[in-house]
Structures are given as C-alpha cells and as structure tokens.
Amino acid sequence: MFNWNNRKVAKIITLIIFVAWLFVLILIAVVVLTKGNNLDILFGWMLPLPFAVLNSLSVLRLASFFASLKNVKKQKAVSFFAFFFTARYLIYLIPVIISFVVTPSIFNTIATIISTLFFPILNLVLSFVWLPLEYFFINLISKSKRKHVATGDSFKRN
C-alpha cells in the first residue's frame, strides 16, 4: 500500500479526493436547483464532510508525527497508533447515525451513506493506484539516468 510518510504525495491524494467530492457536490447542487425538491440529498451528501476533513488531517498529521519518533518510542507507540488508525474510521459512523436519528426529510440516509463511503474507498483506490504509478515513474527515471559503461565483454577479438 501507499507510504503515508511521504507528505507531498499524501497531500496530493487528499486533494484529489476532495476535488472529486466537490465535483459530485456541484452536480447534486445543479440537480437540486433544476428540480427543486431533492434538498435532502444535498444535505445528506454534505453531512460527512467535516468528519472526512478530520480523518484526512489525522492521516497527514499521524504519519509525520510517527515518523519523527525514535525507534524505541515507535515500538512503544505502535499499539496506540494501531488503535487510533483503526478508530478514525469509526468517525465515519457519526454522520450515518445522525442521518438515521434526524428526521428523514432533512438528511437523505442513502446519500449520507454513499458520501460517507466515498472518502475511504477513494482513498484506498488512489493509494493502490498510486503505488504502481510511482514505481513505474521511478524506474523510468532511473533508466533514463543510467549511462552505458563498456565492460569489455562487448569488444570483438582482433
């Protein structure tokens, strides 16, 4: 999977996720403005945004904080970070619970669930797509920087 210690790439992946989410939000807003009766879908789609921002910030900050620790402290902190890394996905349950509890006319539950699943699934897809692309480009760059060195095997006998 993707190495989240690379903050530059982690920021790019997070930005791609939010741009895709914003694109879908604009499409839903256009549909709501043209039809005028699906406001609950718009609110349902927007409900998980604060929780997704919190989750993305925790990914970026946890990786840099964990990388700054020394090896001895890393071994002690692994169990805590494993729990916290798993627990941050529980944050995504909060908007779904809110959409179930609040009157269905305000938040569309299906739109909330789809929007809630949008962030972690797109995060996983981009992480697994990014790794082969990064590997391909690193190999491409390293092949272009190689210089041909004659070893003597290619010379013909006189």
Curated annotation (Swiss-Prot):
The keyword Nucleotidyltransferase does not apply. Disruption phenotype: Probably essential, it was not disrupted in a global transposon mutagenesis study. It is found in: Cell membrane. It comes from Mycoplasma genitalium (strain ATCC 33530 / DSM 19775 / NCTC 10195 / G37). This is Uncharacterized protein MG406. Keywords: Cell membrane, Membrane, Transmembrane, Transmembrane helix. It is a multi-pass membrane protein. The keyword Transferase does not apply. The chain crosses the membrane at residues 12-32, 39-59, 90-110, 113-133. Its main location: membrane. GO terms for cellular component: plasma membrane.
